[in-house]
Amino acid sequence: MNRSTITRYLTRTFLVRVLSVLFALSALLQLLDLLDAASTVLERGLGGGGLVYYTMIRLPMVMERVVPLAVLIGSLSTLWTFASTNEIVAMRSVGMTPYQIMGALLPAALVISIAHFIMADQVAPRCERAFVSWWTATELPSEKKDDDPVKPVWFRLGDHVVRIASISDDGKHIEGVEMVTRDADGKATGLMSAVSGDHGPDGWQLSGVVQTEIGEPLRVTQSDKARWDVDLSPNNMIDLRKPPENIPFNRLLRIVRGNWAGGESPTYYATRLHSTYAAPLASLVMLLLAAPVAHGMRRRGGAMGSLALGTVIGLIFLLSSGILSSMGQAGALPPVMAVWSPLILFAAIGGAIMVYVEG
């Protein structure tokens, strides 16, 4: 048996195991979510078709979150099977080292990482937007709570700070507009307020505008109508009104560069931007953490220990990544450190364990 045949066999087995675990975990989580929402879907008169649509539109969002865990379990399962059936010994007998065995799985892990990036960056945000639109359109009048106060929206627009009391569902009508203008040093230079605003072919037109210029003397001007020259599209307003959980890479980049308004702090979006790069690479780290299972520890009676070690370290990696990312989004840690430190640290741990076991 030549190495190309072994490589194809390894790749096929690895991909089948990972995809099986991915679909199993996603189906379980989606089933739990569906059990919670099934009564609401049926009360809206959507029937069985509504249940199917609910499941399919939310499934990509669930799958995107469990890819690293599926790679960890799939890698451990694949290597454990090879070790328990002495296939690892057979591979080593034809001259393949454990490093070459793991290297044969690397292209498949890279394909999974690329697919994970596409799903998180393109598929999940579109599914979330479609789900929100469908869920809002089918909402019953009895489900709407008129007594709930409408929360104003705060966001940064360049150096300025904007507050909008309410935004319409289509993002083309706003009420209660206030904008504090600031200079490059962050010092307030004026205040603009308007009763309402509407978006048309020429941009935003404000009504009942009052502009205050801070200085000596204080200047206050009023006008019935005024054009609001800002780069705020109706889609941007919709995102501000209902912030999406899944944000595509291009949108995050525009927010960080100041070309798209966001309701969170700059560190939050910078952390999310770094996570867009780092999250798909977690699959490679998971494969590395599973490597000790393939390193002949079965001969020492430590196969179960290596399996448990890979599982525990992988779960700790996921937990620490989530905690540090939350700290980065809150501004407690620099975004680069919050996102990349667990990835680099656990990749180093996995590599060190692999070298130690082989040595």
Regions found by a protein language model. Give the residues of each.
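Extended lipid/amphipathic-ligand handling interfaces
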Residues: 164-165, 194-198
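Signature tryptophan residues that serve as conserved aromatic anchors
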Residues: 154, 204-205
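Transmembrane alpha-helices
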Residues: 1-158, 169, 217-220, 230-359
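Extended beta-sheet lipid-handling architectures
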Residues: 174, 192-194, 206-211, 223-225
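Short, solvent-exposed aromatic-acidic interface loops
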Residues: 180-184, 209-216
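Short hydrophobic/aromatic-rich beta-strand segments that constitute the beta-sheet cores
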Residues: 163, 176-179, 205-208
